[in-house]
Amino acid sequence: MRYLPPRLEKPDPRFEANAGCVLLTHDPDAETPALALHLLRHAAENRDALAQSVVGWCHLFGHHLPLDPVRGAHFLRLSAEQGHPDGLFWYGLCLCEGRGTRPDPATGKQFIVRAAAEGNYDAREWLDEQQAPAE
């Protein structure tokens, strides 16, 4: 079964990122995740911030892609540099925890604060947890 139109002369990275995300979360057969990851990787290599955040997250946690925190942090940093809320949060967390990069909690928290300001739910939750009194 084909999910996409015939090969485009110059694929649109945002289309590839969106299609990859949809296919990755709707797994009807064994070939779908491979196609999704192909689309996401291609879009990430073409500077799509959404794709970079998804590929980075997948590498960071070893979900759908090999566990590789350094590669994960790399893609998340690229996404964060473009201001993508998920990239900001996950790269900030990498910095706070030293996952795939040298620890820098102060800078990491700045990224997470920016992610929360952009509406990232996980960032808001993380900040709330950091402000909660220790039990």
Describe the function of each predicted region:
Residues 11-16, 25-27, 45-48, 61-63, ...:
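Short helix-capping/linker turns of helical repeat alpha-solenoids
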Residues 49-50, 61-66, 70-73, 77-78, ...:
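Tandem repeat protein-protein interaction scaffolds
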Residues 7, 41-43, 77-79, 114-115:
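Canonical positions in the second alpha-helix
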Residues 2-46, 50-54:
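N-terminal segments that cap or nucleate solenoid repeat domains
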Residues 3, 116-135:
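Terminal, low-structured helical/coil segments at or just beyond the last alpha-helical repeat
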Residues 29-39, 66-75, 102-111:
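Structural signature of tandem alpha-helical TPR/SEL1-like repeats
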Residues 18-26, 54-61, 88, 92-97, ...:
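Hydrophobic face of amphipathic alpha-helices that form TPR/SEL1-like repeat modules
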